[in-house]
Amino acid sequence: MRFLFAFILLCSPWVSEASQNIVTVKTIHEVASDILYDNTNYWLILDIDDVLFEGAEALSHSSWFERSIQGMRALGASEKEAWEAIYPEWLAIQHQGSIKQIETAIPLLITKVQNQDKIVFAYSERQLCAQNVTFEQLATINLSFDKPNLPYASLPPSISFTKGVLFGAEIHKGLGLQLFLDAQPDLPEKIIYIDNEKYNVMRVGEVCNQKNIPYLGIIYTAPKYLSPTYLPDIAKVQYLFRQKLLSNEAAALLLRHRLDK
């Protein structure tokens, strides 16, 4: 009898784990139809940097920020110390710089999913102080997440959900979304998450697993196949003349003629 009870318990849907699927794509076209024709009441969540857009200059690109963090850590700073030291400068550069889309198909996909009355929003590690510049950047590519109408309870002050963007204010993805889900009266039938970093996709998957939410994680590698925007030598020139952020072309011209010396 005990064996029979254990067998029934193991087979019971109430104790089964939610399905998880993680895929890697070079272009959003590879998964667009899977997303659009998914009949579940899912949430589509997208990362911002290097998914919706990337910095158009070497200095405004996320790679400059990441390399700067690595440089400070090599000098003995903790990850938190490096972030706190570099973030204000990165934020100022974002106000000066410009952005460019990675794939024009992504805004089209977002619009189509929104037209299906599905929940679509962005999720970023960006700090709360970066909200204004983030909305300005999204506006330059005519991208809006204003439609989500989620009846969440009050959120902790460490995160913000504004105009359809969840600002996690975190070094690593995961906790911000977990806190947001904790505030929801009802959870989605499924979460589809798109990010260019594998470790972010895995962390969001862990959150979904804890909440028993079926999950499709999409590792978006399209930026790797584009001509690189971040070039260390160009970024150095732009940093020297950062009072007015130079384009990559202008910085390359200065570098070529050694005017940066």
From Swiss-Prot:
**Membrane topology field:** Peripheral membrane protein
Instruction: Please report the organism this UniProt entry assigns to the protein.
Output: Chlamydia muridarum (strain MoPn / Nigg)
What protein am I looking at? Putative outer membrane protein TC_0650
Give the UniProt subcellular location, in the record's own words. Answer: Cell outer membrane
Determine if Membrane is one of this entry's keywords: yes
Q: Which residues form the signal peptide?
A: 1-17
Keyword entries, A-Z: Cell outer membrane, Membrane, Signal
- Main location (coarse class): membrane
Give Gene Ontology CC terms: cell outer membrane
